[in-house]
């Protein structure tokens, strides 16, 4: 049975999760909630997308609900997650994509309205984090879980592959990251992050990220061995992980490429991709993989010290994994 899904927060990730749900048919979205968007505006925002293009299906408003390709999706406008009547629509698996309710306690408010499980589409301070292809098999039935971050979803499959094969001693990551909705179009106030308040489309902006350290949470043997930072760049979508790593074993760059290619065609197929083409960022737009290893972009200094680079659509690939995680946990919950 296809899991019935509700989405709280109809922003970039909320809308792209819905696109992925419709594209795959793997889950059925039956309800949406966003207190800041009324149904006609939600229709417009979903239909027209500057990054991923116009929605090719049929969408209209009927009363207070959306009807997409003939299927009704309940639309709520509650500010408090505890007041969202998920049970009325049959939504059991809730995608928490507001970026606000990212702790177990805050996300648990959804249960008051009839939710069965909450999947936070962001890193969480205390909810178990899962990265598909890396540690989903450790899922133990927690009712609030996290899909980690888009950058962790790019780095972790790569790090797992390299660590399993060659043993990582230590690694540093730089995420060359497209700007996001949290940034400013022109210089503006940002008291906690002064650089982050500068104009997104005009600047390269060094920033912090917990994505690399989070790899240690999903791959415990790498805890304390990997860290990183990010640079926000003036592009609207698609990012690039630059991972410099020291191995315990002697290895050539060709062996690194071969290991990643093997993983991309085997256990990580559909999650980790491999390319030897001379691609640039727009070539990854709307790509559903978590991570696309760029074989030509990496380099080795010696037999232990290597730089690898991997692309990711930080919206689309990440949102596809949200859908995949829901499918996975729903099967586990059903005892399959």
UniProtKB/Swiss-Prot annotation:
Q: Does the keyword Methyltransferase apply?
A: no
Going by the entry's taxonomy, the superkingdom of the source organism is recorded as: Eukaryota
SUBUNIT field: Homotetramer.
Instruction: Describe how its activity is regulated.
Output: Inhibited by koningic acid through the interaction of cysteine residues with koningic acid even at very low concentrations.
Q: Which UniProt keywords apply?
A: Cytoplasm, Glycolysis, NAD, Oxidoreductase
Pathway(s) served:
Carbohydrate degradation; glycolysis; pyruvate from D-glyceraldehyde 3-phosphate: step 1/5
Anything else known: This protein is a koningic acid (antibiotic)-resistant GAPDH isozyme. It is present under antibiotic production.
- Name the principal localization, coarsely classed: cytoplasm
Indicate which residues the UniProt annotation says bind D-glyceraldehyde 3-phosphate.
Answer: 149-151, 180, 209-210, 232
| Similarity field | Belongs to the glyceraldehyde-3-phosphate dehydrogenase family.
In the record, biological process GO terms are: glucose metabolic process; glycolytic process
The taxonomic lineage of its organism, from the top, reads: Eukaryota, Fungi, Dikarya, Ascomycota, Pezizomycotina
Q: Which gene encodes it?
A: gpd1
- Residues the record annotates as the site (Activates thiol group during catalysis) are 177
Write the protein's name.
Answer: Glyceraldehyde-3-phosphate dehydrogenase 1
Instruction: Report the SMART domains cross-referenced here.
Output: Gp_dh_N (SM00846)
One molecular function GO term is: NADP binding
